[in-house]
């Protein structure tokens, strides 16, 4: 990367990924291509953001496929470090996020965001991008990384792009490959619950308890869904309140068989 820094002229955009790319990732690459002279994608399945009983070992990997997709999308550079590159022997320094990690994904997956922030901070330090691009599907992650970059005076603009969905509304995710046909059909209930929340808000329903109950009912109507959380949170703080507003984001997480999926939607 040091040699690369000497060669690169102009703004650098970074698209950090864990590989097994889909159209959501490629939309981030295209956004960088529009804004930055140089676009770098990274591929690294980060072990420190997985819990002891999560899917690190079986997380889908296909580097050859990913490289072809990135080349076709016009990425300029691809950074594919090894675990030893990112976490050499004796590594013992971590980036610990604050209050934003205490709810939602952070509550269900202890230590997850410590791993995320540490690896992203290292990527920012190694690649030194002007902009970094993240998808809305991992909204809490986006907020935490944006706060980290600000708090640590990292000279990078953290950008968020909208969720990319299948035609039937399922949010694109590398983990969708785990789903059986029946589970995939069942997973559409997450999108339906979010549409329910937005519809109620559009109809002037502002009581969070009422909207959350309706969302929960929609998901529980699907017998294959096991809810982790249904949340109506302020989009800047992730705090819940009794009344929703134009600044509220609805977030859901559920398991379908052994596959855990998340999704979200702004109410306005």
Swiss-Prot record:
InterPro entries documented for this protein: Pantoate_ligase, Pantoate_ligase_C, Rossmann-like_a/b/a_fold
Residues annotated as binding beta-alanine: 49
UniProt GO BP: pantothenate biosynthetic process
Transmembrane segments: none
Residues that hold ATP according to the record: 18-25, 135-138, 164, 172-175
Enzyme class per UniProt: ligase
Keyword Cytoplasm annotated: yes
Chief location category: cytoplasm
EC number(s) stated in the UniProt entry for this protein: 6.3.2.1
Keywords: ATP-binding, Cytoplasm, Ligase, Nucleotide-binding, Pantothenate biosynthesis
Gene Ontology annotations for the cellular component aspect, listed alphabetically: cytosol
Cited Pfam families: Pantoate_ligase (PF02569)
GO molecular function: ATP binding; pantoate-beta-alanine ligase activity
Keyword DNA-binding: no
CDD domains: PanC (cd00560)
Annotated residues for binding of (R)-pantoate: 49, 141
Active site: 25
Pathway: Cofactor biosynthesis; (R)-pantothenate biosynthesis; (R)-pantothenate from (R)-pantoate and beta-alanine: step 1/1
Catalytic function, reaction form: (R)-pantoate + beta-alanine + ATP = (R)-pantothenate + AMP + diphosphate + H(+)
Family note: Belongs to the pantothenate synthetase family.
Subunit description: Homodimer.
More info: The reaction proceeds by a bi uni uni bi ping pong mechanism.
Official protein name in the record: Pantothenate synthetase
Gene: panC
